[in-house]
Each structure stands twice: as C-alpha cells, then as structure tokens.
Amino acid sequence: MGTPCHYALFDLQPAFRLDLDKLAVRYRELAREVHPDRFADASEREQRVALEKSAALNDAYQTLRSAPRRARYLLAIGGHEVPQEVTVHDPDFLLQQMQWREELEELQDEADLDGVGVFKKRLKVAQDTLNDDFADCWDDAAQRDKAERLMRRMQFLDKLAQEVRQLEERLDD
C-alpha cells in the first residue's frame, strides 16, 4: 500500500496557497471517519488499517498546514527532493538572520514585551512575503533553486517565530 498524496487525501490539487480554515474543517471530517476508536470492534487487520490511515491523515494535515513543510512537500512531489541539512549559501539572508537573532536577544535581555510584539509583526510580514514569493515560483522548473532557497528561508523564519512565541510566554508570566 503506497502513501497517498497529502493533497489527494483532502481532495485538493497541489498548490501552495491553501485556505487553512477549510483544510482544518476537512481534516476534522476525515479524522472522524478514520478514527481508530470507530474500529474497536473490527478485526485486527481493520484496526491496523484504520490506525495507518489516521496516522497518514495526521501527517498530511501537519504538513499542509505549515508553510515551510508544505513548500518542502511541493518541491518533493515535483521531483525536487530537498535534503534536510545543507550549507546555506545565501549571505544576505545569513546577515539578516544574525540581525534578527541579535534583536531578539536584546528584547529578551530587556524583557521588552511590547518590543517583542513589534518584532513579531515584522516577522509575520517577512513570512507573508516569502510565502507569496514561493507561491509564485514553486511550480516553475526554471526557478527550482529560487524556490528551494525561499523554502529554507521559510524554515528559518518559522523556527524564529516559535522562539518569539516562547519568549512572549516567558515574558508574559
């Protein structure tokens, strides 16, 4: 049994831009259908299949709801498997990363919750810009390198956004 395309599980065509609210509604509908508890009285084989379907659905949903994971997945199904770990040759973005990290460290040292809020808004704008840029080029074979570079930038910003949320929680306590 092969793993079905994440998009096919949700009756979607591969695309970067998705309505995440509709995706969540469809996920809940499908999750109810394949939930292992519904198969408690079924045969062992049917229970195993239900568990596998539930796990595949959860993985597909987690992938599609995350912009960086969705970008990586789109590149992979397009035949451009992206290695997890590579040396990034993007000096401008590396410099930007260092500046963001320094700024976040200063906000933490100063316990500046308002400043963190402003930083978070700027980060969201940067993420939205990357998402738009990726959406415009991911399915163009001539722009695969650009799409991969944008996907890696998305991954960094996603990780930075998680760190910002954690800092917000610490400062808010």
UniProtKB/Swiss-Prot annotation:
SUPFAM superfamilies assigned to the protein according to its UniProt record, in alphabetical order: Chaperone J-domain (SSF46565), HSC20 (HSCB), C-terminal oligomerisation domain (SSF47144)
Domain of life (superkingdom): Bacteria
Single GO cellular component term: iron-sulfur cluster transfer complex
Presence of the UniProt keyword Hydrolase in the record: no
Pfam families: DnaJ, HSCB_C
Protein family: Belongs to the HscB family.
Entry function: Co-chaperone involved in the maturation of iron-sulfur cluster-containing proteins. Seems to help targeting proteins to be folded toward HscA.
Name the record gives this protein: Co-chaperone protein HscB homolog
Source species: Pseudomonas entomophila (strain L48)
Gene that encodes the chain: hscB
